[in-house]
Amino acid sequence: MTVGSLTHIIMLICTAGLITLGCVVIRKIPKVWQTVMIIAAVLVCCSCIFFRYGMGLSWEKGINLKPLLMQQLQVCNFNFILLPLALIPKFKLPKQYAFYFSMFAASTTLFALSSDWKPLEWYDTYVLNSWVSHSFAIASPLWMWSAGWIKPHRKYILPVSGCVFGYFTIVYIICEIMKGAGLMPLEQSFSFIYKTDGIPIFDTFHKWIPVPYWHLYLAFPILVGFFFLLSSFFNRSVSFITSGADKMLKVYGVIGDEITLLHGGDSNEGYYLSAWKKLDDEGNEEILYAPGETIKIGKKNIVLHAVWKPISADEAESVTSECSEEGAFVDA
């Protein structure tokens, strides 16, 4: 299986379709099933990593934790620890790390492919295991984002970047210790510390700074720029439209940085809207606009005539569900 082959392209298309379908479906189902779907994605990814490195891709060899622990020094296999941490509700940094960096790292593997795959068919256990684990390392944070678990704000860009290079630093220190103790051969490498694995950008970095580990710091400004673009894309402003015979405007979507229109309708005097609200870092709700203020929805300037009683996220979810059944709900 080689890069750009028909099999490779078909697998990429099928994987992208599955992940996209999951993003659509997870928005439409109740929260409990969203949680089940995300946990299942994390379990699939972690199970593939465990089966490959903890069991040697065989049910007969038994469990050997040493290779599994060693492979936590590899960027993509670190998802075995990272993604379960991202399931903890108030633990935001692992979610941001998974969304900004791990998802990107896993996607590069699917596009570039490992040189080990060349003599293998697509249905080989080694290929399928690696493909599925990397696919769900992408799907897990994307589905978390679609379900509202992750909001990739720019304030997390520098902390995540620091964690990325903190991870590489820890890997480098451990590798140096193992090399000094004769526990790791010189030709072995984790996370591009010593070897570039033929990847052009790392080859270039190593030519500019031919020193193990330190050449990776040339990637820092590139990562920060990429994270900024990623944040801008997933936090872009949303334009709304009205639908339904009664001209009801009923929207539940993200505007810019976690601002949410919970419920709205139409009156003879103009749009009759509820509170525009957001959650602060402690989870407290804050009303952003008061009656009489003008806001812009699409190309229309709308005056808020009233703010209805504050409603919780669960109540808002039930409202949008009812609107959807009426056919007047606009999914943002």
Language model features by range: what are they?
Residues 18-24, 82-83, 136-155, 168:
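Alpha-helical transmembrane segments in multipass membrane proteins, preferentially the mid-helix core
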Residues 85-147:
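Membrane-proximal helix-loop-helix units in multi-pass membrane proteins
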Residues 9-17, 72-82, 98, 128-139:
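Membrane-embedded alpha-helical segments of multi-pass membrane proteins
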Residues 43-53, 102-114, 164-173:
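Aromatic-anchored segments of alpha-helical transmembrane domains
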Residues 51-61, 111-122, 177:
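Juxtamembrane "helix-exit" motif on the non-cytosolic side of transmembrane helices
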Residues 25-37, 88-96, 147-158:
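Membrane-interface helix-boundary motifs at transmembrane edges
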Residues 1-13, 157-162, 166, 182-228:
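Membrane-interface transmembrane-helix boundary segments in multi-pass integral membrane proteins
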Residues 238-332:
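Secondary-structure capping and domain/repeat boundary segments
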